[in-house]
Amino acid sequence: MEKRKEKAKESIQAVLPILFIVLLLSFTVAPVSASILLEFMIGAVFVIIGMLFFSMGAEMSMSPMGERVGGSMLKTKKLWVILLLGFFLGVIITISEPDLQVLAAQVPSVPNMVLILSVAAGVGAFLVVALLRILFGIALAPLLVVFYGVIFVIARFVPDNFLAVAFDSGGVTTGPMTVPFIMALGVGISAIRNDKHAENDSFGLVALCSIGPVLAVLLLGLVYPAQGSYVAADVPEAFNSVELGRLFLYEIPYYLKEIAGSLLPIVFFFGIFQLVSIQLHKKTLIKICVGLLYTYVGLVLFLTGANVGFIPAGNYLGTVMASLPCPWILVPVGMVIGYFIVKAEPAVYVLMKQVEELTDGDISGKAMQISLSVGVAASVGLSMLRVLTGIPIMYFLIPGYAIALFLTLFVPKIFTAIAFDSGGVASGPMTATFLLPLAQGACTAVGGDVVKDAFGVVAMVAMTPLITLQVLGLIYKIKSNKKEEMAEQPLLQAEDVFAGYADDAIIEL
């Protein structure tokens, strides 16, 4: 009961600031129709309840499933079996990610199924790389430098229309379905190792899996022509209470089907392991089943609320604010929204909990949340600046990733892994359903190119936490070094006091 209250409090605290900001803007500088405002408020209630169910469900089901599958995979003691299972697992959970369908629709020149399978194969391939890294204790930083180097070299030859969507894909595909399972898989596999670095190596799976989709879409950009254009989504308005209710009720069956299709492959995969290898006790299995039900209900409510309530509000607010005499208000407003919106990402709480547990509280959830919020605030501010000025996204991504990769030389390894994991976690469904429509609405209002200038918000949100969390790691390292120096000082002072005495004189004293 206490845990439910805590989860409910977290969910309310995550969404209320966003609700307050939107209401404040609606009643002051950005007038919004009553219909869209009501849709947003009802959507916020759906999101709060959905977050509550999802956070409880992920803790009860997705995390223990991932850990046990990871441990079970290693029992085969055959590397090729482990890697083959890892690849198929990566493909299955990526295809099951709801946001991947949205991404596919954003690239009109590439057939949907080609893009989905390519991205899924990219995640599968890099999950194999991540598993090899854990099994052989390979450092994460050099891998990141090499793979991001390859990405930016390929990006040089890809049409501009593909760049923003390609980098967005890395954040979109590591969503609420993928993150809890992949992170738990890493914990399960690293637990087999007994060396002191095993705990640190359990992080970094999401970081590497985020690279696969980016590479996949960039490679598709070399093959397919950059044709097609962005088509603005209709903003539905309800003219009475019945129509308002229908907007939500019509979407619920769609997401019931969508999330069922997303969860079933993971449940099927786990079921095979349960029958062949894991064989959990009935009580544990029932708990996991209840957790899966919570996860299912939570994601259905969350995505219904976010898509029906948040997308129209974000799009409309962006359009209105960009049409004001001073459209630059978008930059500070975007930063404030970005600061608070990351708290409403479902997978963020999964990451924070795991970090606190594995570091024995040395890295607190609060410090991590503040670092994430600061990073996302900066990224949304820069994204709004791009919308208003049309600055190419690579002018931000190349220096940003260069700084992030440079910091890996000085930061404790665990902070590097957590930082690059957090990039994929921070850029979840809230970014896709509120921040991206905000940018699209603003871009349309100023007459910009939506494909080049508005898309890329997810990529920016995924990038800045890499820097802010590593800066947190640098501060942590400096403080730890100072503590060690202070602990050694009294001992050194005692040695200085007795330095002039002979051994027998010290004994007499």
Which role does the model predict for each range below?
Residues 1-11, 15, 66-80, 194-205, ...:
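Intrinsically disordered, low-complexity non-transmembrane regions of multi-pass membrane transporters
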Residues 8-14, 38-44, 72-80, 140-145, ...:
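Alpha-helical transmembrane segments and their helix-start/interface "positive-inside/aromatic belt" motifs
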Residues 70-72, 79-150, 327-408:
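Helix-loop-helix junctions within the multi-pass membrane cores of secondary transporters/permeases
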Residues 236-347:
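Transmembrane helical segments that form the transport core of multi-pass membrane transport proteins
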